[in-house]
Amino acid sequence: GGGHFLHSRFNDVMDWVFEHSPRSEWNKFQAKVLIDLEGSPVEFPIELNLWQLPTDQQVEYLYSYLTASKKDIEYKNFEDWIRNYLGDKIADNYMIPYNKKLWCIDPSTLNTDWLIKIPNTNAKLVLKTIIEKNSNFTEEVVSHRSFYYPKEGGFQTMFNSIYEHIKDRVVLGYKTKKLEYDSQNKIWIIDDKYRTKNIINTAPWPVLDVHLNGFNFKKEFEKLKYLSDVISLWEREPYDHKAQWKYIPNPDIEQHREFYIHNYAPYSKPGGVMTDINSIRWRQHNKKWKAGVPLYEHENVYSYPMPTTDYKEAIKNILFYCRDYNLFGLGRWGQWQYFNTDQCIKQVLDFFNSDDIKKFDFFKTF
């Protein structure tokens, strides 16, 4: 799950995708991502684009970043990391308000395990961008420096292409509810209907009723928190910029992120915008807000696993116990990790290429 575009630092993932959905059916773009920083548009990643700010703000943000980046500490939580790695200016005006909008919880209650998604920068690189007035970074810094998007049909076409290769082995439109282990015959029974020796679960664990030797799944599931959000489509006047999406930390604007569809899907109608808002904020606004002429709205209950400070023990207990009975969890929900599409595919490729799946390292990204 996850990911609106195709990009990856894993060559084997890109090769696998293009084996199922030919590269010729994709357009490649250089990413242009904006941050609404104190009313000024600054490109992402922020620390490599401070040179785009007015001079007086450049000095303040750069000083804050450089003095923070010298601190050699062990980060206790996500807010600790933000303040001590990026500095208080970026923390207070971008990262903390943005993440409060995204997660609707205090960033100090989030851990740092998911920071593989954060740009890999350093003070030397930041200073270089200020002097040269050019962010000039590579995929090693940010994996989505460039990305692919289907020439037609939207991102779903990738999954449709994969499905065409395996459709004789896929049941669509079926909602699994119960997994029960028959210890005498050492098989799994799915919804009292299907029987199998092995199961790979990619669904959110809490939607399943799992019965296995009296293991208390409910207790562990209660520690697995998740974010729900609302995706909306709007029509606006055609935009006069080339950005594909923007992060919006301003708490007075409902959405935390918006996508400019025509800038990566040129076959779509000019002025089309997709917005993302946490369901909690959506309800706080009585489900009534406006970011253009409304076209469509959908609430996605399971959007992101929340990297809280106590979830890791729970998902480890689940995965390590279940694997001895050939029940494995993979992907964003199976491993309860903040994975994008490419990372989900990478986990599957590594899982099936491992010498012993019972010893597969579910947490090698930590």
Please name every model-derived segment.
Residues 21, 146, 218-222:
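Short, P/G- and charge-enriched loop/turn segments at secondary-structure junctions
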Residues 27, 169-173, 296-297, 328:
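General small-molecule cofactor/ligand-binding pocket signal
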Residues 40, 58-182, 194, 202:
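Active-site/ligand-binding neighborhood in enzyme catalytic cores
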Residues 175-290, 296, 314-321:
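Mid-domain catalytic core of redox enzymes
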